[in-house]
From Swiss-Prot:
The lineage of its organism: Archaea, Methanobacteriati, Methanobacteriota, Archaeoglobi, Archaeoglobales. It is an enzyme of class 3 (hydrolase). Keywords: Antiviral defense, Endonuclease, Hydrolase, Magnesium, Metal-binding, Nuclease. This is CRISPR-associated endoribonuclease Cas2 1. The keyword Phosphoprotein does not apply. GO terms for biological process: defense response to virus; maintenance of CRISPR repeat elements. It holds the Pfam family CRISPR_Cas2.
Length: 94
């Protein structure tokens, strides 16, 4: 299932290590602190356990959000980067 992972991590080093971990899980960066990609239920559980170590103070937070096919196919992306951020049919680029 497609997932969106967004985070706010205050420590620069921890934030960089978290990004590398998300890339190891095959997720693609779509914003500075946001990644998206396919995770099976087992990988999602493993990822959830591993990212907990990056939450160290009250300001730190990580969301792992599942996106159903219908929701992801109706996404609206507002960007001028020219980077292919999504591949689903029906996604509107503004």
């Amino acid at each position: 299932m497609l997932h969106l992972v967004v985070y706010d991590i205050s420590d620069d080093g921890s934030r960089a290590r978290l990004a590398k971990l998300l890339e190891k899980f095959g997720l693609q960066r779509v914003q500075y602190s946001a990644f998206r990609g396919e995770l099976n239920p087992n990988d999602r559980e493993v990822l959830a356990r591993q990212v907990g170590k990056f939450v160290r103070d009250d300001r730190d937070c990580i969301f792992i959000i599942p996106l159903c096919q219908r929701c992801s196919s109706t996404a609206i992306v507002i960007s001028n980067t020219g980077v292919e951020l999504v591949k689903e049919k029906g996604v509107e680029f503004v």
